[in-house]
Protein backbone atom coordinates (compact mmCIF):
# COMPACT_ATOMS: atom_id res chain seq x y z
CA UNK A 1 0.00 0.00 0.00
CA UNK A 2 1.38 3.37 -1.00
CA UNK A 3 1.03 6.05 1.56
CA UNK A 4 0.09 9.53 0.26
CA UNK A 5 1.64 12.46 2.10
CA UNK A 6 -0.84 15.15 3.10
CA UNK A 7 -0.54 18.36 1.01
CA UNK A 8 0.86 21.29 2.92
CA UNK A 9 -1.57 24.16 2.96
CA UNK A 10 0.13 27.61 3.00
CA UNK A 11 -1.76 30.14 5.06
CA UNK A 12 -2.11 33.62 3.44
CA UNK A 13 -0.08 36.43 5.01
CA UNK A 14 -2.21 38.76 7.14
CA UNK A 15 -2.79 42.16 5.50
CA UNK A 16 -2.04 45.02 7.87
CA UNK A 17 -4.83 47.52 7.25
CA UNK A 18 -5.04 49.05 10.70
CA UNK A 19 -1.81 51.18 10.53
CA UNK A 20 -3.03 52.92 7.38
CA UNK A 21 -6.25 53.90 9.12
CA UNK A 22 -4.32 55.32 12.06
CA UNK A 23 -2.23 57.47 9.71
CA UNK A 24 -5.31 58.90 8.05
CA UNK A 25 -6.83 59.68 11.42
CA UNK A 26 -3.68 61.51 12.53
CA UNK A 27 -3.59 63.53 9.31
CA UNK A 28 -7.22 64.52 9.78
CA UNK A 29 -6.55 65.62 13.36
CA UNK A 30 -3.59 67.72 12.20
CA UNK A 31 -5.78 69.40 9.58
CA UNK A 32 -8.40 70.23 12.18
CA UNK A 33 -5.80 71.86 14.41
CA UNK A 34 -4.33 73.88 11.55
CA UNK A 35 -7.69 75.28 10.41
CA UNK A 36 -8.39 77.36 13.55
CA UNK A 37 -6.16 80.04 15.11
CA UNK A 38 -4.28 79.20 18.34
CA UNK A 39 -6.00 79.57 21.72
CA UNK A 40 -3.66 82.38 22.82
CA UNK A 41 -4.78 84.60 19.93
CA UNK A 42 -8.46 83.95 20.66
CA UNK A 43 -7.96 84.79 24.36
CA UNK A 44 -6.13 88.06 23.60
CA UNK A 45 -8.87 89.12 21.14
CA UNK A 46 -11.61 88.33 23.67
CA UNK A 47 -9.83 90.25 26.46
CA UNK A 48 -9.12 93.28 24.21
CA UNK A 49 -12.77 93.36 23.06
CA UNK A 50 -14.11 93.52 26.63
CA UNK A 51 -14.74 96.97 28.16
CA UNK A 52 -14.64 95.89 31.82
CA UNK A 53 -12.19 97.90 33.92
CA UNK A 54 -11.55 95.11 36.43
CA UNK A 55 -10.68 92.62 33.69
CA UNK A 56 -12.38 89.58 32.15
CA UNK A 57 -13.23 86.63 34.37
CA UNK A 58 -12.72 83.02 33.26
CA UNK A 59 -16.45 82.24 32.75
CA UNK A 60 -16.94 85.48 30.78
CA UNK A 61 -13.92 84.62 28.64
CA UNK A 62 -15.34 81.14 27.94
CA UNK A 63 -18.65 82.69 26.86
CA UNK A 64 -16.84 85.00 24.45
CA UNK A 65 -14.88 82.08 22.98
CA UNK A 66 -18.05 79.98 22.64
CA UNK A 67 -19.76 82.87 20.82
CA UNK A 68 -16.86 82.89 18.36
CA UNK A 69 -17.47 79.19 17.55
CA UNK A 70 -14.74 77.72 19.76
CA UNK A 71 -15.49 74.40 21.56
CA UNK A 72 -14.92 75.38 25.19
CA UNK A 73 -15.86 72.04 26.79
CA UNK A 74 -13.30 70.00 24.82
CA UNK A 75 -10.55 72.62 25.05
CA UNK A 76 -11.02 73.65 28.69
CA UNK A 77 -7.50 72.57 29.64
CA UNK A 78 -6.02 74.43 26.64
CA UNK A 79 -7.76 77.65 27.68
CA UNK A 80 -6.23 77.45 31.14
CA UNK A 81 -2.76 76.70 29.77
CA UNK A 82 -3.10 79.57 27.28
CA UNK A 83 -4.01 82.00 30.07
CA UNK A 84 -1.01 80.94 32.16
CA UNK A 85 1.39 81.28 29.20
CA UNK A 86 0.05 84.76 28.31
CA UNK A 87 0.44 85.92 31.91
CA UNK A 88 4.01 84.56 32.05
CA UNK A 89 4.89 86.33 28.76
CA UNK A 90 3.43 89.60 30.00
CA UNK A 91 0.74 90.03 27.35
CA UNK A 92 -2.00 89.64 30.01
CA UNK A 93 -2.13 90.96 33.55
CA UNK A 94 -4.02 88.98 36.24
CA UNK A 95 -6.02 91.48 38.31
CA UNK A 96 -7.85 88.96 40.53
CA UNK A 97 -7.34 85.34 41.66
CA UNK A 98 -4.43 82.99 41.11
CA UNK A 99 -3.59 80.66 38.23
CA UNK A 100 -6.25 80.24 35.56
CA UNK A 101 -9.11 81.19 37.89
CA UNK A 102 -9.51 84.92 38.19
CA UNK A 103 -9.87 87.99 35.98
CA UNK A 104 -7.43 89.05 33.30
CA UNK A 105 -6.61 92.29 31.52
CA UNK A 106 -4.44 93.31 28.56
CA UNK A 107 -1.02 94.75 29.39
CA UNK A 108 -0.98 98.35 28.06
CA UNK A 109 2.81 98.38 27.60
CA UNK A 110 2.72 95.30 25.37
CA UNK A 111 -0.23 96.69 23.38
CA UNK A 112 1.63 99.97 22.76
CA UNK A 113 4.77 98.02 21.80
CA UNK A 114 2.80 96.05 19.21
CA UNK A 115 1.34 99.25 17.78
CA UNK A 116 4.81 100.79 17.22
CA UNK A 117 6.05 98.11 14.78
CA UNK A 118 2.92 98.71 12.70
CA UNK A 119 3.82 102.39 12.46
CA UNK A 120 7.31 101.40 11.31
CA UNK A 121 5.82 99.21 8.59
CA UNK A 122 3.71 102.08 7.31
CA UNK A 123 6.83 104.27 7.22
CA UNK A 124 8.64 101.56 5.25
CA UNK A 125 5.72 101.39 2.84
CA UNK A 126 5.96 105.15 2.30
CA UNK A 127 9.69 104.82 1.69
CA UNK A 128 9.04 102.13 -0.94
CA UNK A 129 6.83 104.44 -3.00
CA UNK A 130 9.72 106.76 -4.01
CA UNK A 131 11.74 103.70 -5.09
CA UNK A 132 8.90 102.78 -7.41
CA UNK A 133 8.89 106.34 -8.83
CA UNK A 134 12.68 106.38 -9.50
CA UNK A 135 12.53 104.36 -12.77
CA UNK A 136 10.75 107.37 -14.34
CA UNK A 137 14.04 109.32 -14.35
CA UNK A 138 15.56 107.32 -17.24
CA UNK A 139 12.62 108.51 -19.37
CA UNK A 140 13.78 112.10 -18.82
CA UNK A 141 17.25 111.16 -20.05
CA UNK A 142 15.66 109.88 -23.26
CA UNK A 143 14.12 113.33 -23.71
CA UNK A 144 17.55 114.88 -23.22
CA UNK A 145 18.89 112.67 -26.01
CA UNK A 146 16.21 114.04 -28.33
CA UNK A 147 17.35 117.59 -27.61
CA UNK A 148 20.92 116.60 -28.44
CA UNK A 149 19.75 115.25 -31.78
CA UNK A 150 17.98 118.53 -32.55
CA UNK A 151 21.07 120.67 -31.92
CA UNK A 152 22.95 119.55 -35.08
CA UNK A 153 20.02 120.84 -37.18
CA UNK A 154 20.48 124.28 -35.65
CA UNK A 155 24.18 124.16 -36.50
CA UNK A 156 23.35 123.37 -40.14
CA UNK A 157 21.11 126.43 -40.52
CA UNK A 158 23.81 129.04 -39.78
CA UNK A 159 26.16 127.21 -42.14
CA UNK A 160 23.59 127.42 -44.94
CA UNK A 161 23.02 131.11 -44.19
CA UNK A 162 26.76 131.69 -44.39
CA UNK A 163 26.83 130.08 -47.83
CA UNK A 164 24.00 132.32 -48.99
CA UNK A 165 25.89 135.38 -47.85
CA UNK A 166 28.95 134.24 -49.74
CA UNK A 167 26.90 133.76 -52.89
CA UNK A 168 25.49 137.28 -52.57
CA UNK A 169 28.96 138.79 -52.17
CA UNK A 170 29.81 138.46 -55.91
CA UNK A 171 26.96 140.87 -56.65
CA UNK A 172 28.69 143.43 -54.49
CA UNK A 173 31.86 142.79 -56.41
CA UNK A 174 29.97 143.51 -59.63
CA UNK A 175 28.66 146.71 -58.12
CA UNK A 176 32.18 147.65 -57.15
CA UNK A 177 33.32 146.87 -60.68
CA UNK A 178 31.15 149.66 -62.17
CA UNK A 179 33.94 151.86 -63.45
CA UNK A 180 31.65 152.55 -66.43
CA UNK A 181 30.73 155.82 -64.73
CA UNK A 182 34.34 156.86 -65.09
CA UNK A 183 34.00 156.38 -68.85
CA UNK A 184 31.10 158.87 -68.89
CA UNK A 185 33.34 161.56 -67.40
CA UNK A 186 34.92 162.44 -70.81
CA UNK A 187 31.45 163.64 -71.89
CA UNK A 188 31.77 166.59 -69.53
CA UNK A 189 34.23 168.50 -71.78
CA UNK A 190 31.47 168.53 -74.46
CA UNK A 191 29.33 170.55 -72.08
CA UNK A 192 32.24 172.96 -71.71
CA UNK A 193 32.38 173.33 -75.49
CA UNK A 194 28.69 174.16 -75.58
CA UNK A 195 29.32 176.91 -73.07
CA UNK A 196 32.15 178.22 -75.24
CA UNK A 197 29.86 178.31 -78.28
CA UNK A 198 27.42 180.60 -76.51
CA UNK A 199 29.43 183.80 -77.36
CA UNK A 200 28.71 183.02 -81.04
CA UNK A 201 25.01 183.42 -80.29
CA UNK A 202 25.61 186.84 -78.72
CA UNK A 203 26.71 188.31 -82.07
CA UNK A 204 23.20 188.55 -83.49
CA UNK A 205 22.18 190.43 -80.38
CA UNK A 206 24.57 193.24 -81.37
CA UNK A 207 22.51 193.83 -84.53
CA UNK A 208 19.42 194.74 -82.52
CA UNK A 209 20.53 198.33 -81.79
CA UNK A 210 20.88 198.90 -85.53
CA UNK A 211 17.30 198.05 -86.12
CA UNK A 212 16.28 200.52 -83.44
CA UNK A 213 18.20 203.25 -85.16
CA UNK A 214 16.46 202.51 -88.45
CA UNK A 215 13.10 202.85 -86.73
CA UNK A 216 14.16 206.25 -85.36
CA UNK A 217 15.16 207.45 -88.84
CA UNK A 218 11.82 206.43 -90.23
CA UNK A 219 10.04 208.36 -87.54
CA UNK A 220 12.03 211.48 -88.32
CA UNK A 221 11.11 211.28 -92.02
CA UNK A 222 7.43 211.40 -91.12
From Swiss-Prot:
The modification N6-methyllysine is found at residue 26. GO terms for molecular function: chromatin DNA binding; DNA binding; double-stranded DNA binding; histone deacetylase binding; nucleosomal DNA binding; structural constituent of chromatin. CDD domains: H15 (cd00073). Residues 1-16 have a biased composition (Low complexity). The modification Citrulline is found at residue 53. The modification N6-succinyllysine is found at residue 33. The modification N6-acetyllysine is found at residues 17, 45, 74, 164. Interacts with MSX1. Belongs to the histone H1/H5 family. This is Histone H1.5. The lineage of its organism: Eukaryota, Metazoa, Chordata, Craniata, Vertebrata. The gene is H1-5.
Amino acid sequence: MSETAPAETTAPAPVEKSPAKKKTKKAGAAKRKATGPPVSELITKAVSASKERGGVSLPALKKALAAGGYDVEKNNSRIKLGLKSLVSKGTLVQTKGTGASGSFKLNKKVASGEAKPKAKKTGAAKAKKPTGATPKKPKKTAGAKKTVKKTPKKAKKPAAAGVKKVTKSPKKAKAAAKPKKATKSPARPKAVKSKASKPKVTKPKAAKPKAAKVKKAVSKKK
